[in-house]
Amino acid sequence: MHNWHRQFLGRTQMPPEVSALAISEFFKLSGAELQAVLSRYGVDMRLGAALQIGFLKMCGRPLDKLQRVPAAVLEHLCAQVGGSPPDLATLRAFYSNAPRVLYRHQQSALDVLGLIRFDATSDSPRVLEAICDKVRAGVDADKLLAETRVILYERRYVLPAPRAVGELAKLARETVERDIGGAIERAISPTTRVRWVEQLFESRADGMTRLEFLQEPPGSLRTGSITRQSDKVRTLLEMKIADMPGLPGTERYWQMYAAKMRNQRRSRFAQRKEPRRSIELVSFLRHSLADHTDTLIRMVDRRVSQLWGRASKQAKADQGALPALTVLVAGVRQAINDQEHTKGERFDAIVDLVHRYDAGDLKPLSIAARQRALLVNQIRQIRPLLKSLVGLDLQADDASQWPALIGAWKDAYTRGADDLTKTMAPPKSKVWTMLLEDPNANPRNAAEVQLLWDLRQALRRRTVHIPTSLSFQSRAAMLDSRGSTAIAARSSCPVKTMLRELNEEIEHGLERVSEAVQRGELRLDGTKVKVRRLAAQRRPPELKDIRRELYKAYARVQFPDLIMAVDAETHFSAEILGRPADNETELLHLYAGILGQSMDLSASRLSLMVGLSPEGLAHAMHVLEDPAPVTRANEAILTFMHSHAIARTWGNPFDCAADAMSLDMPEYIWYTSPDPKRRVAGAATYVHTHGWQGIFSDRSIMITQRQPGPAIDGILGQALSKIARVYTDTHGFSAYGGSLGWTLGILMCPRLKNFNDRRLHVPSGGHILIPNNLKNIVLPDISLKSIEKGWAGHLKVADAVMSGRLSATTAIELQGAARHGDASFRAGHAHGLLLRTNDLLRSYTDPDYRREKLRYLNHNERTHQLQRQIRHAGSGSTRGKRQEELGAQSHCLALCTNLVMAYNTSSLQRTLDAWKRQSGREVDASIQRFISPMGFEHINFNGVIVFPFDHYRTQLLAPRWGVRGRRSGVIQPIRPGSPGR
């Protein structure tokens, strides 16, 4: 079922307006449906029967009242069943005079479509488990009602009355709560739960309760902020939350109930009834421990990268400043402090140093050695980081050195000891030996610096793990395939067959490159391949005039008008709320929340809009932090956009481009980094642009984060289109990521920076015939045996990613540079190098392929220009400290970008249709291919924000007696109650 179909389910009246997409989807009768209508009824009766069939397909309920039926629907049906469309009054009068005919038409439609009426007593058990699965997946409130209607519709039931749907959803929620509550009752004693409640609402020395302290978002990367984040984890560990036994339920379910504790008052919490009270308590505690633990590790990881990077930069800067003299001074100082030798021996050592200096034999320390020395001198910044990590609930294999090492350091920090015992000594390393044995330095400081780096790497490779974490669990737990049958798309392909076919492609590619060199199309310069610049693409001569006319036809529009115009076609607001808005106030708050998140508008700016309340705006912001409904809204907009004929000329629906765009953020947020180009602090949104245009996937990332993982995750996490190929830039590709993507059925096609300088990696051992003129640019260093040896482990990682147990981002981090000794990593890395070679060979000899890469990536850049125009105000709010807030900004920015492109696409199609209808003028598809929907010159994003409800009230608001049986005159907030209730 399309996401945009959900908005119609449960209606008993025809919407006042039905889009052309909905008419073609629901009121176009199939061959069997048309035959049934024509064979059963005469000309006068066919229209009513066909109308009932179309309405049942659209809404899942019979059409009871004919208060309104759009003329376009009647015309479309009459064109199929014959006859001329009557006016609505005639049709209504016909049914009023013959009520039995209405019933027969309804029953006939049920028979034709194979629908059965829902009986609550006998049919509820058949669908209850499916609805319970939705509850376990974290679906609640109005969204659960929408999912219940979808489940009933897909099982061919006639949707019952709203009250029956609500009772069914309530039964499913209570069933799951009873199961989870029973598990909590058996696993956690009432005394323990009472103690946890007392501790949560107990005040700290700073006046905050523990609940308020644990809900505080993380700060910057300063030592004080990291220490405060460590205090949150320590608070939860002291409450023995890590000892909580395993409980049923998905992480999304626990997160949903944990959110209900936000800003909770003790009096309100005491009024909660069991089992919900215990579920909310346990959910909050276990989710807080996992979330704060992950955040602390990420903060320490970023701080370590920051400190190591600064030290490296300083070491490089100091390298040219009298390096030999610096070594001489250090040697003289060491000789003077050497108390084990006599004064004469120390004097002779100094003289020897001076002679070596005069002879030029003194060599400075390497940059890496100077970097380590600088870090040891920064122990006041290093020690709090190590203390924060050691204080976590770290676990490791008993056979490794980590359990004893972590225990020794944890005990030393607890006792306040400042010595370095044998059990605290980190693993021996040649590069750290000099600092550990330097008599002028404190060996404990050097040991702490080394241990911090080693522990960071161990957490990355999961040799040290945390059972209560979400992202840093053990490698075995992450790759555990029990309970899942999902496998990677190419898991069934034998490795030998795959390598043979890939080798053949590479060999043919080398032949093409060799022939191109002989013809003079390519030139070799040592190990480089000189590729000619692409010639300007030939465009139809009439393109410029047609494009100008099409863009000139755009009507100048205010952004709020544009939002409501597209919402009237797609009903994306109903997707976000889980139902049509009840009144203008609710819809206004939702629109304001979307604008506030996408444009990062401050609360003072939003408060200028008439009719907003702080409580309603807070609710709207909270609703938008849930990514699932916003994703469905985006898909509804894209489905509408791609339904236009012009969109299908813009590219291939199985291709996409992926790239990141920076989002300006305040510097005091821990995950911000300076944009390398603009030197402005911010995070980034990683977007995937569809071949038919439009952003179908987006996610928030850090600017410094490697992007192959998000490039793969964005494709796997969407259901709009079956993407088989993704075009990326250099940052979006790595050898291992390319192999992982190929295994998952995604071919990564990178546009590499300086691709002329890239060596062509091919199999060693003579498996491929290398032309003589390409010997210098080909590097036969890939072992096919190593690929075959580690391929099974590589497929195991791919299967875990496909099943959702592991994200591609985490998998690439897990298998990354920290695991060079792992056979599965070596297999994936070597296979990725072969894929990169194959792509380079095609790029060298196929100009059309290179041009297609540039075209897709340029479209992505045009999309970023539109996003920057929408978000031109920069960081005007203080939101974004929590990951959910940053994700909401990314999702809403993609939503607004798609709104603009969908509006432009619809306008372009209307203009083309008007040309064809009025003068018979048609524009060839080869010309439409060059028409872009990303223009924004005709849109005013500034000024006073006013939404024209008078024009769209009937299309967007729930009917007087709508799906939920509630009168539209009653103002309902987006979520009932004030924040925290």
Predicted features by range, described:
Residues 2-500:
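Long amphipathic alpha-helical coiled-coil/heptad-repeat bundle
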Residues 60, 606, 656-662, 726-731:
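Short, conserved catalytic/metal-binding motifs centered on acidic residues
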Residues 504-607:
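Structured, charged N-terminal subsegments at the starts of enzyme catalytic cores
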Residues 581-582, 598-652:
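Electropositive nucleic-acid engagement tracts
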Residues 627-684:
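Active-site-proximal, Lys/Arg-enriched surface segment
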Residues 676-717:
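Electropositive, glycine- and tryptophan-enriched low-complexity nucleic-acid-binding patches
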Residues 726-736, 753-759:
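Acidic, metal-coordinating catalytic cores used for nucleic-acid/nucleotide bond scission
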Residues 779-981:
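Long, compositionally biased intrinsically disordered regions
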